[in-house]
Amino acid sequence: MNDRKTTKDFDQDLLHLFDQYVHGGIDRRGFLDRAAKYAVGGVTAAMLLDQLSPQFAEAQQVKPDDNRLKTERVSYPSPNGNAKTGGYLVRPANATGKLPGILVVHENRGLNPHIEDIARRLALDNFMAFAPDALATLGGYPGDEEKAREDFVAAANWLKTRPDCTGKIGAVGFCYGGGMVNTLATQMPDLAAAVPFYGNQPSAEDTARIKSPMLIHYAENDQITTRGPAFEEALKAAHVDYQMYTYKGTQHGFNNDTTPRYDPDAAKLAWTRTVEFFNKRLR
């Protein structure tokens, strides 16, 4: 990965443009048209898009066939006739007793190898990690947000009631998933720990319903972060037990080691805090 691009290789406005593309604000053609002015020195807009896009194989930290883990594809009922929804379940191979569970909520393009890798990392820290693909039944993103929320709540309840789970569960999510973790915290009073990475914030009215302790991670160069202070005021007003960190010089997606927006130092610190938080709240 030493020869891969970093955020220093790209104009900040291009990074914001890519963020719009990832979140559905513009389509591929719109990105290419607007990115053309940054394509210099023989580099095309299409090449810039490729450089900014995930490289899953290069960033894998834990192999899918790691013999320390037990992995399986599972399905669980999607509520209100939304059909079956699948997911990726990972446990330590040598686990002998019940484990606390962690719901791993994907970004806005659905379950992918990076999120599966995140689940494996958590399992190596002796958690049962479940990464549902809750957008699959909705035809991808954007879809019906209410149905997506219902599917993630169903996934959390499915995980919590497994006979090999202690019944204590947390949730971690990234981007779209960070916003969904915030939503789950407003909807699930029994959620024992919530960790949103750069996720959209709930309203002050919804924040007042949060019972879960929260660990909140933001990137400095991210429009979502500008709404962080209002969210923090709502958390304080609701007497929520929370910690909030903004990582200097980082971009939206700084924890995702498959793209140039990855910041290894910030990601390491944020992940260390995350695992410590789950150990404290779920054990």
Placement of each model-derived feature along the sequence:
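Alpha/beta-hydrolase active-site loop
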Residues: 114, 140-163
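Primarily recognizes the serine-hydrolase "nucleophile elbow" in alpha/beta-hydrolase
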Residues: 153-211
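N-terminal export signals
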Residues: 19, 28-54
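N-terminal secretory signal peptides
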Residues: 1-30
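Short amphipathic alpha-helix adjacent to the substrate-entry channel of hydrolases
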Residues: 113-132
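Short beta-strand element of the alpha/beta-hydrolase
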Residues: 98-107
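N-terminal cap/lid segment of alpha/beta-hydrolase-fold proteins
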Residues: 59-95
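Short beta-strand/loop motif that positions the catalytic acidic residue
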Residues: 216-218
